[in-house]
Structures are given as structure tokens and as C-alpha cells.
Amino acid sequence: MPRKPALSNNPDWLRAARTAVDDFVAELQAGIDSGDAETYNAHFADDVAWGSPYGATLVGYDTVHSIHARMFAQPPAVTGPSSRYETVHVMAPGPDVAIAHVRRVALDVDGEPIGIDNKSMFSEMALYVLVRRNDQWWLAAGQNTPIRPKP
């Protein structure tokens, strides 16, 4: 069987993708830290596709933003713990495409990670696809998966 191609092997594309993902993750962190959906969603494309950690598929900025705005308007006891975002892996299969795995770690009141066996609060692993248009990076798609113990 012939060897399959590597899609993320251009160092210039990868450097640009890493910078874009770092900036995007910093924006998510700032939005969640301040409870501001405008900041959190600042670079979600108008036609963003979003997979929620509860299995819903949402399409369009207005739909996703309205959910995040309601979520951030709730008191912390309802919205959940504070969080820390961590970039796990970045790929650049093209000059204007970044694909990233980003972990959201749920934190307790002391800033320590909440265990994966907690039934009400959970961390997530997200897969984000960013696309550059007119020198600006936009989130085209995101899929969020709760991190849970193996069954």
C-alpha cells in the first residue's frame, strides 16, 4: 500500500496556524474569564458550524452567540466552574486553514482541575477549524466533546 501524504508539513503554514490558534484561544480565555460572549465569539464566522458538548449541531453566528450570551449571563453556580484553555495540537493542511485540538479544563474554586468523574461539571476537548479570509482568521467549525472516564 502506498504511503499516505502528510498534510501539515509546510513550516510557514504551520507557524501562521499556530499563531492564529494561540490568538483564538487567548480570545476564548478572555471571554470566559470576563463572562463576555461578544469577546468569546468575536471571531466566529457568520456561518459557523458548532457541535455542542450535549450533542446538538448549531449553525450560524446568531444561533451560537445567543446561546453563549444566555450562558454567560447566568451566575457561576449555573454556568459552571472557571476554565483554562490549553492548545493540544495544531495542523495546517493549507496556507489559510488551521485545525486545532483545544482542551477546556474545568477548575474548582481553588483553581485546581475538576476530576473527570464529576457528574455536573466537566472539561472538554474541542476540535476547531479556523480559516483565514482577508488576513483575518475565523472559526469555521467547532466540535466540543466532554472529557469523561471510560465506561
Model regions and ranges:
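A beta-strand edge to alpha-helix "cap/lid" segment located at domain peripheries
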Residues: 2-38, 49-151
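Helix-to-beta-strand junctions that scaffold the AdoMet/dcAdoMet cofactor pocket
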Residues: 45
